[in-house]
């Protein structure tokens, strides 16, 4: 693989172009890595405090009433964004799994499927689980395939 960097002071935005004969796993990994480096810095709220957590610590985001909560292994923090806003800015390792939940698929260790077509994601080192609806089952499967 060849790498070339061109400096152009006239550019207003950085552009990355990858030329290849085919889309390989190596190129897909590189694309994923580049996308994850621009992950947003979210503010999480609990009580009167503001917290700045690493997105990798978040297991899932879910709605509860009119509020959105981000769950870690032990805590839950309020996020002042809507799920569709989060979905558009979160890295690719977050996947919509139901109408009310976005899960960090890197933190999940199993997906148990039921006969009705729904499922449950279990996370490492916690009792917390999330429901996967039938509607989002194929999206989750595709995202897991792309991540592994």
Sequence positions of predicted segments:
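N-terminal regulatory/sensing modules of transcriptional regulators
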Residues: 1-28
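A broadly conserved detector of short glycine/acidic/proline-rich loop/turn motifs that flank catalytic sites
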Residues: 9, 22, 48, 83, ...
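Conserved binding/recognition cores within well-folded domains
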Residues: 26-125, 129
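C-terminal structural segments of small proteins and small subunits
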Residues: 127, 131-132, 138-139
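N-terminal low-complexity, intrinsically disordered tails enriched in Ser/Pro/Gly
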Residues: 146-148
């Amino acid at each position: 693989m060849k790498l070339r960097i061109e400096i152009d002071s006239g550019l207003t935005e950085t552009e990355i172009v990858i030329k290849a004969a085919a889309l390989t796993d190596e190129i897909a990994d590189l694309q994923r890595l580049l996308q994850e480096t621009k992950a947003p810095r979210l503010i999480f709220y609990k009580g009167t405090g503001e917290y700045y957590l690493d997105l990798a610590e978040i297991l899932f985001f879910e709605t509860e009433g009119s509020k959105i909560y981000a769950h870690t292994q032990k805590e839950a923090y309020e996020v002042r964004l809507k799920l569709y806003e989060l979905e558009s800015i979160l890295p690719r390792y977050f996947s919509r799994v139901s109408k009310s939940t976005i899960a960090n698929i890197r933190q999940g260790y199993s997906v148990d499927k039921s006969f009705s077509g729904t499922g449950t994601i279990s996370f490492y080192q916690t009792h917390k689980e999330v429901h996967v609806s039938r509607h989002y089952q194929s999206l989750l499967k595709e995202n897991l395939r792309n991540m592994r």
